[in-house]
A protein has these predicted regions:
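Phosphate/pyrophosphate-binding catalytic cores of soluble transferases and nucleic-acid-acting enzymes
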Residues: 1-310
Length: 310
């Protein structure tokens, strides 16, 4: 929805898109060019100790450009979309007050949407007893219940992520209303420019596969073992993303070899990326930049014009 006030709202460039498309690198380049700071919009990078598996920016990159909303909570804790929304708005406004330019960068659709569209997220506190009951149910039963209570959320939710499914059910059961009906859109807080990097599908898959190989070489397995030693359960790892899920299953003996685990992980990320692309393609506000050598200069020119108010 468009509002006449858009012209006077603070301007917020937003870099979105699928995994391994180059969002973080482009965000850093733009922040350097326009005296900016970066707010992460990644639902897994909020967790401490999950660095390799989430492709978190390095300490050297953080030293170059301030990054916000990384390492917010421990992996065993819950961090809701509502908590993210409140924290991100606070950080963005602080950056603006200091005369710097905020850039929102990430690939988690719900995090991005709650800032770009300023959704009113239902403020339902975690219900430990209800969650414990739901966690005892098989995934198929949870999905069937969500389909009955909230068909719209059922159609769009990550069906391999029990944590998100349980949260949606939690809101439905506590409020008596579908989760999707409670995400009202308020007036926007920022005038946003949404950019994404577009790669041919086969090249994007090659980038994904190369990233998986790099993560394994950098110590991804050791990172998962460290999380287990810190008390993060295998069940929790299942909900923390594909990399942690597949390595956990291999360590438990559910996958016979490391080579098989890596190959299955790559295929799973390909599938996840297809769903990411479907979600982002639906948003016609996103401007897609062809990946390649000319992309960075094109992005800089677009952001320059956008920030100038033209």
């Amino acid at each position: 929805m468009e509002y006449s006030q858009t012209a006077i709202l603070p301007r917020l460039p937003v870099i979105v898109g699928p995994t391994a498309s180059g969002k973080s690198s482009l965000g850093i380049q733009l922040a350097q060019r326009f005296a900016g700071e970066i707010i992460s919009a990644d639902s897994r990078q909020v967790y401490r100790g999950m660095d390799i598996g989430t492709a978190k920016v390095t300490p050297e990159e953080r030293a170059m450009i301030p990054h916000h909303l990384l390492d917010v909570v421990d992996p065993g804790e819950t961090y809701t979309v509502s908590q993210y929304q409140q924290a991100a708005i606070t950080v963005i406004n602080d950056i603006l007050m200091r005369g710097k330019q905020p850039f929102l960068v990430g690939g988690s659709p719900h995090y991005i949407q709650t800032i770009v569209d300023n959704f009113d997220i239902p403020a339902v506190a975690p219900q430990p007893e209800l969650r414990a009951q739901l966690e005892e149910q098989p995934l198929e039963a949870l999905l069937a219940q969500l389909e009955q209570l909230d068909p719209q959320s059922y159609a769009t939710i990550d069906r391999r992520n029990p944590r998100r499914i349980i949260r949606a059910l939690e809101v439905c059961l506590v409020t008596g209303k579908p989760f999707s009906d409670q995400r009202g859109q308020a007036r926007p807080l920022y005038h946003c420019l949404l950019l994404a990097i577009d790669w041919p599908r086969e090249i994007l898959y090659q980038r994904i596969d190369a990233r998986v190989d790099e993560r394994m070489a950098e110590g991804m397995v050791q990172e998962v073992e460290s999380l287990l030693q810190q008390g993060v359960s295998h069940e929790r790892l299942e909900a923390l993303g594909l990399e942690y899920r597949f390595i956990s299953r291999w360590l438990r003996g559910e996958i016979s070899s490391k080579e098989e685990m890596v190959q299955r992980l790559k295929y799973a990320i390909h599938d996840f990326t297809r769903r990411q692309l479907t979600w982002f393609r639906r948003d016609k506000r996103i401007l897609w930049l062809a990946g390649g050598t000319a992309m960075e200069q094109q992005a800089q020119e677009m952001v320059k014009v956008f920030l100038s108010g033209k």
